[in-house]
């Protein structure tokens, strides 16, 4: 999974006209406070003073639907970020927004203030799932906004939420292919988390959600990571960021503080199982890079335990000359 550096500011629910089934931005972002321009200036200055050059990092406005907030507030935040862009500073500005909050006027404004990347919260490309979860837009809105952003020269990012109410595994695989057809540069994959006070929480109480198991979602995410790699699309996040407010408000769903590592560990398990089947012996000896040892073994040694249940003893040795993606 690709590493991606951002200095993120969260704008909780300020711009969104909808209340989706899963959404409580205050809990997700860990804040109820919408930042003021002065805070943007101070935080960016402190980050530059502390870190020196940040040419590989971006200033990001996440958490809400940025282009749906009042234009004056958008401009105030973007203006506050301008002095911190350029050589030896941040490489650009990244925002997230809804697919139906993108039009020609929005693109012109973003260009004028040096926004370089726009992420669309697609969540699903199944119209039925979008309706059931009160998204307020359809899959065509994602395709249209994606095409507009690419044509205007923005780096396109898309976001998928796995395991929404009413979604099947086939819906997830179909969504992934349709998202890749939009030709994004980056993708974020968020297994759904049920937060207190949301419609999903009510569905849980009624016993009609969730429908997919933890293992199904984990296996899907592993497949998705492989498929994105094949397509040349960088997956820059797997799973929600771990915050105290998220843990406090979480009732159910597919959450782990290191979900990306779980997914990568599942991919290593598949490699190990194939190697064990190919060699046909009761003991499997592998070498791996030092930084990937924990992923090869799995959380709490789960990969080793699973192989043991299949009659294979796993022995792992570190080798600094091996690439991180290989065993």
Q: Residue spans of the language-model regions?
A:
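Short helix-terminating capping/connector loops at secondary-structure junctions
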Residues: 52-56, 87-90, 280-281
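N-terminal pre-triad scaffold of radical SAM enzymes
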Residues: 1-29, 41, 46-67, 96-98, ...
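Conserved non-cysteine loop/helix-boundary elements of the Radical SAM core domain that shape
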Residues: 28-42, 63-185, 189-192, 196-216
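Conserved beta-strand core positions
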Residues: 7, 59, 93, 118, ...
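Auxiliary Fe-S-binding modules of radical SAM enzymes
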Residues: 2-6, 207-324
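Short acidic/His/Gly/Ser-rich catalytic and metal-binding motifs that mark active-site loops
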Residues: 16-20, 195-202, 246-248
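Short glycine-enriched loops at secondary-structure junctions
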Residues: 12-15, 190-195, 241
């Amino acid at each position: 999974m690709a590493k991606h550096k951002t200095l993120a500011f969260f704008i909780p629910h300020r711009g969104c006209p909808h209340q989706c089934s899963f959404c409580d931005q205050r809990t997700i972002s860990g804040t109820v406070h919408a930042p003021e321009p002065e805070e943007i200036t101070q935080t960016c200055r402190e980050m530059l003073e502390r870190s020196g050059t940040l040419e590989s990092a971006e200033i990001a406005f996440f958490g809400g639907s940025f282009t749906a907030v009042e234009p004056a507030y958008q401009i105030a935040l973007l203006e506050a970020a301008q002095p911190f862009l350029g050589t030896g500073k941040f490489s650009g500005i990244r925002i997230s927004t809804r697919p139906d909050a993108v039009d020609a006027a929005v693109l012109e404004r973003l260009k004028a203030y040096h926004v370089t990347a726009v992420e669309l919260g697609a969540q699903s490309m199944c119209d039925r799932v979008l309706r059931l979860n009160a998204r307020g837009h359809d899959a065509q809105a994602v395709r249209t906004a994606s095409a507009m952003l690419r044509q205007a020269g923005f780096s396109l990012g898309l976001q998928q939420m796995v395991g929404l109410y009413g979604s099947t595994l086939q819906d997830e695989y179909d969504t992934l292919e349709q998202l890749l057809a939009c030709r994004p540069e980056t993708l974020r994959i968020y297994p759904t988390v049920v937060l207190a006070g949301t419609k999903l929480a009510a569905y849980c109480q009624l016993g009609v959600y969730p429908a997919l198991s933890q293992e199904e979602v984990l296996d899907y995410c592993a497949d998705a990571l492989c498929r994105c790699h094949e397509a040349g699309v960088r997956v820059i996040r797997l799973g929600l960021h771990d915050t105290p407010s998220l843990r406090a408000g979480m009732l159910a769903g597919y959450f782990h503080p290191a979900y990306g590592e779980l997914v990568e560990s599942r991919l290593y398990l598949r490699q190990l199982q194939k190697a064990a089947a190919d060699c046909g012996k009761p003991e499997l000896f592998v070498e791996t890079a030092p930084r990937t040892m924990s992923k090869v073994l799995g959380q709490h040694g789960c990969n080793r335990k699973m192989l043991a249940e299949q009659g294979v003893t796993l022995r792992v040795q570190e080798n600094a000359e091996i690439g991180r993606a290989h065993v």
